[in-house]
């Protein structure tokens, strides 16, 4: 029960958007949830608020693309949780052992790990829950990440 809390969610899938709207209409009596429709890469750059907590469950290869913009909007001391980061165990393999169709995801996740696990501006924790969670705590206002291009 957090009457002061606000939730902002981003989705681009029309079916999931419809499902979310139905549920928010039924259960969001205090109107604490804002649904932003569109691709996260476009929507994130339009945000003006800051956040204490961000949960990411999207295209795994895009986590590293979304992260710089998310960190801009995350309060110092805030936490980002990234879901399903072990890629069914593939992430621990050599890239040549990963199926060709999964290699873009593999590369994106490797870039994410390279950018975050030893970053002095972040505290990173890998949690072996389900298909893996990466928890990042923002320790300072400015976080330097390698270029994502």
Locate the predicted segments by residue.
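S-adenosylmethionine/decaboxylated-SAM
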Residues: 1-149
């Amino acid at each position: 029960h957090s009457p002061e809390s606000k939730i902002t969610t981003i989705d681009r899938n029309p079916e999931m958007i419809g499902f979310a709207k139905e549920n928010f209409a039924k259960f969001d009596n205090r109107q604490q949830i804002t649904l932003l429709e569109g691709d996260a890469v476009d929507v994130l750059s339009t945000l003006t608020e800051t956040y204490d907590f961000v949960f990411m469950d999207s295209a795994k290869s895009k986590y590293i693309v979304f992260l710089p913009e998310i960190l801009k909007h995350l309060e110092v001391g805030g936490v980002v949780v990234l879901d399903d980061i072990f890629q069914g165990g593939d992430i621990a393999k050599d890239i040549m052992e990963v199926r060709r169709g999964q290699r873009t995801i593999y590369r994106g996740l490797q870039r994410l790990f390279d950018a975050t696990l030893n970053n002095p501006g972040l505290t990173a924790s890998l949690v072996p829950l389900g298909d893996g969670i990466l928890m990042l705590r923002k320790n300072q206002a400015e976080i330097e990440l390698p270029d994502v291009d």
